[in-house]
Amino acid sequence: MVRKIKSQYIALDKQNKVALGNAISCLKELADDSVDFIITDPPYNLGLFMKKRGTNMDKLRNGHFAASGWDDLNFEDWTKEMDKLFSECHRVLKEKGNLIMFMSIIKVETIIGLAEKHKFY
């Protein structure tokens, strides 16, 4: 299960605001084609690798991720959550809007596949 985070909105001026929180939850509150720019840093789902730097590499490469409390979904569940994120990003972004997503190099292939599915390429 993905950890629930309370959303916060910070007004930059009368027209622009920054949303801090679970990206999927925040995006669901927005209208279609209403966003110019999204920057998100979703869980990499690398578990203990992020804590111990360099441990469990064989398991990481085989899609078996260790638990770390906030980053412990199995690969299939993580992929479903990322699919939801891409779907919401595509829905709310304006035609010439931009998405920047931080992600581990280990997940690039999956991320590119989801981006293509949701017409970011």
Language model features: what each stretch is:
Residues 1-121:
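S-adenosyl-L-methionine-dependent nucleic acid methyltransferase catalytic domains
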